[in-house]
Amino acid sequence: FVFQSHNLIEVGKNLGLSSYESFFKIILPSARPAIVVGLSLVAMETLSDFGTVDFFSISTLTTAIYNAWISFDDLTTANQLSFVLLFFILLLFVLENISRRGAKYHQNSKGNKPIPKIQLAGGKSIFATCFCSILFFCSFIFPVSQMTYWTIKFPKYFQDINFWSLNMNTLLLVFLSSLFLITFSFMTNYGNRVSKNKLLSYLSTFSVSGYALPGIILAVAFITFISWFSDLLTSIFGFDSFKNVFIGSVVGLVIAYFVRFFSLSYNGIKSGYSKINNSIDENAYLLGYSKFKTFSTIHLPYLKTNILLVGVLIALEIIKELPITLILRPFNFETFATKAYSYAAQDLLEAAAFPSLCLIIWASIFILFISKYILSE
């Protein structure tokens, strides 16, 4: 809605439409692509959610997949259920594309005026303030206050938690995953920019699809592929099985995170590269700069903000990622998310308060970093 043109409202007025009619007949239909993207994200997050539905003992496909593998050690059933969940996700995209029926949502960028803000007054102002305050209270103030109260009231749970180990494990995953994701994102984006190779472009486009898949499907698919590939090499060449190198290890976690969040990293770097005109590279080559020197002295400084933003977004995703970490983590390897889940699964809500609070604090630090430093740039 913010990026829509005021010209649309003026067209509605010229057609004799009231404010409400203009909104429902012009503004709302024009915002459909953004609304559909938002609804798709909500639908995918809901379908792939594990912690919430498991805590409330609601039987969903994600909990069934997890139980099939962890509780019954039945990888075949886990794969079959994963396929069903994947089918529903693909069905959402297909139905949305069919419903568009070739509709176009382009706007002429010339002469566009932003929609002016409306200063609310009286009852409207009170209602808007109360509504937003209730949302903020229910979603942040109340749960954080309750967790803080439990942490203070039950210090024995705090003393039983290895705080530094949880921090180091969480930050280790964040650092390694961010390093590999950002490095490969630079390699693919710079390769597409320099080589114009269609195969590399297609592979890059295909590789960003992992973010649309629920983490639990990726974890099960990862275990299935590694097990199959290891058994294949063992049967052909007589190699020792290397399953343990990838399954139940930090290496496996980082690879799974890479597949899951490469889209986030790739598109973040790509958006920065789209703002660097190709003529800048051509002028650098005319001045005798090599491709590496152009990359290191021009591209990297220009993309500094994008690198920081991508790193923070990856960190936010990884610290709260639960299904992948639960299934692929090493033995006795805990993060704040898995520790909070393990306590909640035992119905020890008071014990789960402290790791949950630490998770919120880390997320708040990352979000404040984005708002204060990156966005101000």
List each model region and its residues.
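Cytoplasmic-entry segments and transmembrane alpha-helices of multi-pass inner-membrane transporters
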Residues: 9, 122-131, 187-226
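Loop-to-helix entry region at the N-terminal start of transmembrane alpha-helices
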Residues: 33-34, 127-132, 162-174, 212, ...
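Transmembrane alpha-helix signature in integral membrane proteins
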Residues: 85-89, 95-99, 161-194, 199-202, ...
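Transmembrane alpha-helices
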Residues: 1, 5, 19-48, 130-134, ...
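Periplasmic/extracellular loop-to-transmembrane helix junction in inner-membrane transport proteins
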Residues: 20, 24, 28, 67-75, ...
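Membrane-interfacial helix termini and adjacent extracytoplasmic/periplasmic loops
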Residues: 20-21, 53-59, 112-117, 159-164, ...
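C-terminal transmembrane helix and the adjacent membrane-cytosol boundary/short C-terminal tail
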Residues: 2-13, 19-20, 52, 79-120, ...
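Interhelical loop and adjacent transmembrane-helix boundary motif
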Residues: 50-90, 121, 150-161, 319, ...
